Amino acid sequence: MLTWLTRDSLTFPPLEKALHDPNGLLAAGGDLSPERLVQAYRHGCFPWYQDGQPILWWSPDPRTVLLPDQLHVSRSLAKLMRQGRYQVSFDTDFPAVIAACAAPRDYADGTWITDTMRNAYCELHRRGIAHSVEVRQDGELVGGLYGLAMGQLFFGESMFSRADNASKVGFVTLVNHLRDAGFVLIDCQMPTNHLHSLGAHAISRAEFASYLARHLDQPNSASWVA
């Protein structure tokens, strides 16, 4: 039975209560307050829903992750990065990145990044929890991604690309930055061919929960200064 959250409690049900069909649906309801969002990620779940639906909270099994030491960069991508065609920065325009991620795409109907979702993550950015990666070409924003940094874990949320491999360049730059700062895992949530080509793979929900327990409260040395 699906658990419905109330606004006066930040408690989520145990992850093993998540449904098998649809895979990983853990709870519904609640709100997108900064406190609830932080608690959700610490617990091992994330919000994902369409406009007109209640807020839905997910903890899929298996979970797609990338370990920084297992990042795979193809020869063609490495060559592109050496060419210096794109300029990559962190936290210089979080609102523009999340707006671009929310924009309609040719292969999808609608967007799950609602206005309420955008406002919630912009607040997390103001609090120093959510971060963005900007990829520019000749000063124009052509790619990027955003997510949350907590302890030694980074929770990726969404990425976009308006130029060839721009989001891959941003992602590889981010992973290298996180590895050097002591991060041990990037949560990619759901599988895609794009992420698998970069070295992402699936782990069980139980193994993901083990990473949370061991690394959420450990320090990192990441600098996000623009």
Curated annotation (Swiss-Prot):
Key words of the record: Acyltransferase, Cytoplasm, Transferase
UniProt superkingdom: Bacteria
GO biological process, alphabetically ordered: protein catabolic process
Protein name, UniProt field: Leucyl/phenylalanyl-tRNA--protein transferase
GO molecular function: leucyl-tRNA--protein transferase activity
Gene that this sequence comes from: aat
Leader sequence segment: none
EC number(s) reported in the record: 2.3.2.6
HAMAP family: Leu_Phe_trans (MF_00688)
EC category name: transferase
Keyword Transmembrane on entry: no
Function: Functions in the N-end rule pathway of protein degradation where it conjugates Leu, Phe and, less efficiently, Met from aminoacyl-tRNAs to the N-termini of proteins containing an N-terminal arginine or lysine.
Similarity section: Belongs to the L/F-transferase family.
Pfam families per the UniProt record, alphabetical: Leu_Phe_trans
Subcellular location as annotated: Cytoplasm
Principal cellular location given in the protein's record: cytoplasm
Gene3D superfamilies linked to this entry: Leucyl/phenylalanyl-tRNA-protein transferase, C-terminal domain, Leucyl/phenylalanyl-tRNA-protein transferase, N-terminal domain
Reaction equation(s) it catalyzes: N-terminal L-lysyl-[protein] + L-leucyl-tRNA(Leu) = N-terminal L-leucyl-L-lysyl-[protein] + tRNA(Leu) + H(+); N-terminal L-arginyl-[protein] + L-leucyl-tRNA(Leu) = N-terminal L-leucyl-L-arginyl-[protein] + tRNA(Leu) + H(+); L-phenylalanyl-tRNA(Phe) + an N-terminal L-alpha-aminoacyl-[protein] = an N-terminal L-phenylalanyl-L-alpha-aminoacyl-[protein] + tRNA(Phe)
Origin species: Pseudomonas putida (strain ATCC 47054 / DSM 6125 / CFBP 8728 / NCIMB 11950 / KT2440)
Gene Ontology cellular component annotations, sorted alphabetically: cytoplasm
